[in-house]
């Protein structure tokens, strides 16, 4: 799996523009327009990273993040939202967000943050695989 993004944003115009920008920058983006649709996409497909708005109909981004982390605690999440109150930012991080970006934002900065998080995730994945190999060797040698 490489560079697959689940983008959940209820503003369809903004979502389409951001999807196009990320696609131009070599990401495969699935756009969902509410939290329920986002959860459905997440359970039916594999993604490397998720980007969620917070204020959405049917299921807000915080609830969606809780559901995603219950399914796969290692999936990186970025909140991209107009909600810039300290309490909201803290809640985002408490739910396991890797980053919390407030609108308006710099698209180039978002791109670099996505890449940095994906690189970190790949390193952690490699470490887990290496530990698995080591444990297999250890158990096989007994």
What are these regions (language model features)?
Residues 9:
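Conserved acidic carboxylate
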Residues 34, 60-63:
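Acidic catalytic/metal-coordinating carboxylates
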Residues 40, 62-73:
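Short amphipathic alpha-helix used as the core "switch/output" element in two-component signaling
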